[in-house]
Swiss-Prot record:
Protein name: Phospholipase D gamma 3
Enzyme class: hydrolase
Entry binding sites for a 1,2-diacyl-sn-glycero-3-phosphate: H376, Q572, H717
Highest taxon, organism lineage: Eukaryota
Organism: Arabidopsis thaliana
Regulation: Inhibited by neomycin.
Length: 866
């Protein structure tokens, strides 16, 4: 057989079942092309409405394998998320179909066991933002390890652009362009619906009381709630400028960790916590350096002694160990074993939860999942006081883990607080330094509190995860399991149920509509259906031997497509849409977010409408910026930026504006950094001149440079987005494949808006809580507020913010050490008028620590870096 590698197929961020949004990753080399001649490449930006109905007369792909091994593996792993076919007693093919475009899989049917005439009748409504000549339907036979390609059907995108539905029986062709078996056909239908025909995206993100939120998700939109938005772990009164909202209200800056500590103290029934890391010695309240406030561990022990059910679900780092009194911290330094030991003889129940692979996964796939990926959700659920002496559920969701290194304020000190509020809480894993010398790594993050019906969905997520994690495994399965750790709220009359939980009605101008989203699969939760045919009704996607909830990605795509004025993003990572890069297209970083933003801007340019996107990321991912993994991530980040800017430049050329405007008039990337002159707070409240207690020869080179320059990046750990000052999305998910795929890191997020503070409701710019939050973040980053900042889509605002960030970068990079009133830095790359992204002259590497800013293509495990 002649093999002609024409495309790699990797799972994109598309749909499955009847879900509108969501996808997963899968790599596969399809070694043939079923068409002859070249076809025109078309940009498909909109949705593909697809039905994969049935196949007939498929060949028996299993006969050879079972003859070869004597059927020794027959039945092993064949019943996991599969449907029995018409030949359940016969050994034959276990077919399923993948749908792909630009080498990225956008849909997958469930597997039907032992069938040469499978019937799926499976619907996909898939968002696409791909340039391609063909859509591929690949029919495969699922094996115990991997799969075999039976054949493929190709639909030219040029035909789809006519807008007509293409449907019928299509021959399944092999590598020679011939039927894989006489009479073998696939019944399907497909229609392309371009963005301009989709009314869902034309009214803004939160267009009023009748909005249904993100359709086709596991958790629906919940109405009648309240939300508190947080920036950083703490904001001292009077440290940020006032922001005035509609109705004469002044925006109130929340104090996240103090609110969480207060919620713990006031809990009467339950405290449930999930985290990537939870560290018991952390102090949530640090006013006046008061040691009587107690640690997190002490607070939880006290509450458990009062009869409150305290459950803590933490990721079990596979590199940390505790055996016979000896322990290792682990590569990620999450302190999981230390936290478990602290609570061991208390009534606080701590469950260390490994990231398990799916039941039907191969040994290699399981090993990858269990060693590379994590449980990354950060939530706290408590009962709180409600009306009429009853209790209700309140949930905290966001990017802040309750562990060391996370407590910070908008001032983001480097040295001054090492002996006060950051005493015993020093964190800087970027190079070798100490709490005596510094600098600490400043930490910027976003978090939220949900009061209302959506909090019960956060509770449901915890319960589903706890039930799965507490299920006995290995030899423990021989014992009877009766874990009753979770409270049955339906048996506690004083706790309101979901139907009673609305904390505000739609007539209240301060009410919220809130929706909970996740990235998670059936290997991490209990409660997903066993039968994949039932996944459709639960808005779950079908992977191979696994069901997937990918609603965080769906929420991002929905919000970006609905944006009318601007997008503001803060995220720890920003990479994706590799299918549209100029190289490395088959990497598998297939989330749509970067391409959707670029196409949103391009469409606004063609319509000659105002629009801007502001994206804040860390200067570099946490760790040594010279290391191979971080250089590789920075390389992918550079490829993502390049793709976006070139897409925008092409739109400017198309409308003849390339001589007047440039891509950075619409899209800008920023990072955060700060400097301090040589002073430090001391415990008695005074400030003294600070000199390192040790001589420079005793310090490493990076530490010497950092102490001399007295500067460091502010680490952006945020995972949030504001759209048009009317919609906010905050959670634990990064903008990369790990967080958005659903089968890698487990994540959770909330999306919300105030229906009375929307463009549709007001007919003008909303000035509700989300407007106040965005302005407060800008005040933190820029050091002050100007009137131009109220309208981010205006060119005057874009250029003013860029100008200030460039001035801040020059101050950050200068030899002279000066206090920085603002922290927002222009990301240190050069973007020319044609959209080419290159090194900034004179700043090819990061100050002090080195490492190429645009990254390097160094050898490292791919799935670690995307």
């Amino acid at each position: 057989m002649a093999y002609h590698p024409v495309y790699n197929e990797t799972m994109s961020m598309g749909g499955g079942s009847s879900n509108e949004f969501g996808q997963w990753l899968d790599k596969q080399l399809v070694p043939f092309d079923t068409s002859s001649g070249s076809l025109r490449v078309e940009l498909l930006h909109g949705n593909l409405d697809i039905w994969v109905k049935e196949a007939k007369h498929l060949p028996n792909m299993d006969g050879f394998h079972n003859t070869l091994v004597g059927g020794m593996f027959f039945g092993l792993g064949r019943r996991n998320h599969k449907v029995d076919g018409e030949n359940s007693s016969k050994i034959t093919s276990d077919p399923y179909v993948t749908v792909s475009i630009s080498g990225a899989v956008i849909g997958r049917t469930f597997v039907i066991s032992n069938s040469e005439n499978p019937v799926w009748m499976q619907h996909f409504d898939v968002p696409v933002a791909h340039s391609a000549a063909k859509v591929h339907f690949v029919v495969k036979d699922s094996d115990i390890i991997g799969s075999q390609i039976i054949g493929a059907v190709e639909i030219p995108t040029e035909q789809l652009c006519s807008g007509n539905r293409i449907e019928g029986l299509f021959p399944i062709l092999n590598s020679r362009g011939k039927p894989c078996k006489q009479g073998a056909v696939l019944s399907l239908s497909i229609q392309y619906i371009p963005m301009e025909r989709m009314r869902l995206y034309q009214k803004g993100v939160g267009f009023g009381v009748e909005c249904v939120g993100v359709p086709g998700t596991y958790f629906p939109l919940r109405k009648g709630g309240r939300v508190t938005l947080y920036q950083d772990a703490h904001v001292d009164d009077g440290t940020l400028p006032s922001v005035h909202l509609d109705g004469g209200i002044q925006y109130r800056h929340g104090k996240c960790w103090e609110d969480m500590a207060d919620a713990i103290r006031r809990a009467r029934r339950l405290i449930y916590i999930t985290g990537w890391s939870v560290f018991h010695p952390v102090r949530l309240v640090r006013r006046n350096n008061d040691p009587t406030q107690g640690t997190l561990g002490e607070l939880l022990k006290v509450k458990s002694q009062e009869g409150v059910r305290v459950l803590v679900l933490v990721w079990d780092d596979p590199t940390s160990r505790s055996l016979l009194g000896f322990s290792t911290k682990g590569l990620m330094n999450t302190s999981d074993e230390e936290t478990r030991r602290f609570f061991k003889h208390s009534s606080v129940q701590v469950l260390l939860c490994p990231r398990y692979g799916g039941k039907g996964h191969s040994f290699i796939k399981k090993s990858e999942v269990e060693t590379i990926y994590t449980h990354h959700q950060k939530t706290m659920i408590v009962d709180a006081e409600a009306a009429q002496n009853r209790r209700k559920i309140v949930a905290f969701v966001g990017g802040l883990d309750l562990c060391n290194g996370r407590f910070d304020t908008p001032k983001h000190p480097l040295f001054r607080t090492l002996k006060t509020i950051h005493k015993d809480d020093f964190h800087n894993p970027n190079f070798v330094t100490t709490a005596d010398d510094g600098p600490r790594e400043p930490w910027h993050d976003l978090h939220s509190k949900i009061d209302g019906p959506a909090a019960y969905d956060v509770l449901a997520n915890f319960e589903e995860r706890w039930m799965k994690a507490s299920k006995p495994r290995g030899i423990g399965r021989l014992r009877t399991s009766s874990d009753d750790s979770l409270l049955r709220l339906d048996r506690i009359p004083d706790i309101m149920g979901l139907s009673e939980a609305s904390s505000a009605n739609d007539n209240d101008p301060e009410s919220w509509h809130v929706q909970v989203f996740r990235s998670i699969d059936s290997s991490s939760v209990k409660g997903f259906p066993k039968d994949p045919k039932e996944a459709t009704g639960r808005n779950l996607l079908c992977g191979k031997n696994i069901l997937i909830d990918m609603s965080i990605h769906a929420a991002y795509v929905k919000a970006i497509r609905s944006a009318q004025h601007f997008i503001y993003i803060e995220n720890q990572y920003f990479l994706g849409s590799s299918f549209n890069w100029d190289s490395n297209k088959n990497l598998g970083a297939n989330n749509l977010i970067p391409m959707e933003i670029a196409l949103k801007i391009a469409n606004k340019i063609r319509a000659r409408e105002k629009f801007a996107a502001y994206i804040v990321i860390p200067m570099w991912p946490e760790g040594a910026p010279t290391s191979n993994p971080i250089q590789r991530i920075l390389y992918w980040q550079h490829k993502t930026m390049q793709m976006m800017y070139q897409t925008i430049y092409k739109a400017l050329v198309e409308v003849g504006l390339d001589g007047q405007l440039e891509p950075q008039d619409f899209l800008n990337f920023f990072c955060l950094g700060t400097r301090e002159v040589g002073t430090r707070e001391v415990p008695d409240g005074t400030v003294s001149v600070y000199n390192s207690p040790r001589k420079p020869p005793q310090l490493n080179a990076a530490q010497v440079q950092a102490l001399k320059s007295r500067r460091f990046m502010i680490y952006v750990h945020s995972k949030g987005m504001v759209v048009d000052d009317e919609f906010v999305l905050i959670g634990s998910a990064n903008i990369n494949q790990r967080s958005l795929e659903g089968t890698r890191d487990t994540e959770i997020a909330m999306g919300g808006y105030q229906p009375h503070h929307s463009w549709a409701k007001k007919g003008s710019r909303p000035r509700g809580q989300i407007f106040g939050y965005r302005m407060s973040l800008w005040a933190e980053h820029l050091g002050f507020l100007e009137q131009e900042f109220e309208e981010p889509e205006n060119m005057e605002c874009v250029r003013r913010v860029r100008q200030l960030s460039e001035l801040n970068w020059r101050q950050y990079a200068a030899e002279e050490v000066t206090e920085m009133p603002g922290h927002l830095l222009k990301y240190p790359v050069q973007v020319d008028r044609t959209g080419k992204v290159s090194s900034l002259p004179g700043y090819e590497t990061f100050p002090d620590l080195g490492g190429k800013i645009i990254g390097s293509f160094l050898v490292v495990e791919e799935n670690l870096t995307i």
